[in-house]
């Protein structure tokens, strides 16, 4: 199947486009491809579908109105973020080191400690919040990301910390490095379409069912040589630039400004994928 992320491919779908006042070029340029029925089009990136076009309407404005979180609408490099199974071992995610906005909370353990007086009624546990990069400010349910300084409050019981971090601060380097572009794009795409009157949205928190003991499998242990040289827990998957040492996990990589191996200043990091 042709790649509909490409404008040229989308344009080819408008061969029998029936709307004279909106050119195929305009529609394709705004991320849409023609579904081949009536005047229905779909965004190749967020999957929102729009129909019943009226003269004078602006495809770009309508796209933003109905799917404000669409990565195409927001100008994210959606084409460059797709990873295929054929080239994953050669794929890297690059982030320039700016430094954490709150160095005091660069380490996960410090973020966990900040939640010592976190309201007990909150469904989000301190470990979950800290893992997603947040520390507690000490007021209400106000939290902030240690790296991008993004603040979130008014947490709902069903809110997942990582998903909320992505939805509101998708450009955060910590988010991009730890979760990866595929996860970021997935969360954004799922959130970008506004619920319609026929859309059912689940608000219930997931319920964990007990797993029979016989089905529990031990996770394979990481070889000592591959353990992060900062936390000694996670696997090394980040390469420091310019020295080239792969000695840190994604969570720890942004907590240091010097390579722990050679002590050279780190200017950027690369997330590496091993086949």
From Swiss-Prot:
Read off the Pfam families from this record.
BIR (PF00653), zf-C3HC4_3 (PF13920)
**Membrane-crossing segments per the record:** none
Q: Which cysteine-cysteine pairs are annotated as disulfide bonds in the entry? A: none
List GO molecular-function terms, semicolon-separated: cysteine-type endopeptidase inhibitor activity involved in apoptotic process; ubiquitin protein ligase activity; zinc ion binding
Q: Which GO terms describe its biological process?
A: negative regulation of apoptotic process; positive regulation of canonical Wnt signaling pathway; positive regulation of protein ubiquitination; regulation of cell cycle
Zinc finger (RING-type) stretch: 228-263
Q: Can you tell me which residues bind Zn(2+)?
A: 145, 148, 165, 172
**Keywords annotated in UniProt:** Apoptosis, Metal-binding, Repeat, Zinc, Zinc-finger
Q: Source organism's superkingdom?
A: Viruses
* Ranges for the BIR repeats: 7-73, 108-175
Q: Which InterPro entries match?
A: BIR_rpt, IAP, Znf_RING, Znf_RING/FYVE/PHD
- Family matches, as SUPFAM superfamilies: Inhibitor of apoptosis (IAP) repeat
Q: What does this protein do?
A: Acts by blocking cellular apoptosis rather than by preventing viral stimulation of apoptosis.
Name by which UniProt lists this protein = Apoptosis inhibitor IAP
Question: Could you tell me which species this protein originates from?
Answer: Cydia pomonella granulosis virus (isolate Mexico/1963) (CpGV)
């Amino acid at each position: 199947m042709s790649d509909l992320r490409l404008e040229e491919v989308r344009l080819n779908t408008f061969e029998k486009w029936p709307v004279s006042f909106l050119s195929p070029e305009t529609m394709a340029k705004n991320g849409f491809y023609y579904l081949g029925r009536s005047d229905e089009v779909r965004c190749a990136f967020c999957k929102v579908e729009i129909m019943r076009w009226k003269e004078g309407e602006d495809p770009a404005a309508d796209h933003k109105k109905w799917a404000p979180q669409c990565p195409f609408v927001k100008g994210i490099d959606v084409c460059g973020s797709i990873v295929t199974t054929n080239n994953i071992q050669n794929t890297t995610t690059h982030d320039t080191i700016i430094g954490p906005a709150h160095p005091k909370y660069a380490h996960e353990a410090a973020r966990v400690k900040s939640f010592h007086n976190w309201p007990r009624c909150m469904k989000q546990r301190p470990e979950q919040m800290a893992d997603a990069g947040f520390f507690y400010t000490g007021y209400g349910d106000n939290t902030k990301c240690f790296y991008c300084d993004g603040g979130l409050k008014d947490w709902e019981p069903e809110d997942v910390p990582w998903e909320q971090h992505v939805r509101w601060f998708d450009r955060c380097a910590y988010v991009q490095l730890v979760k990866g572009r595929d996860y970021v794009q997935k969360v954004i795409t799922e959130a970008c379409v506004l619920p319609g009157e026929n859309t059912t949205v689940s608000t219930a928190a997931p319920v964990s069912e007990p797993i029979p003991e016989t089905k529990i499998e031990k996770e394979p242990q990481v070889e000592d040589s591959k353990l992060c040289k900062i936390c000694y827990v996670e696997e090394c998957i980040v390469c420091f630039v310019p020295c080239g040492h792969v000695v840190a996990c994604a969570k720890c990589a942004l907590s240091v400004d010097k390579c722990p191996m050679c002590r050279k200043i780190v200017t950027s990091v690369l997330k590496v994928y091993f086949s």
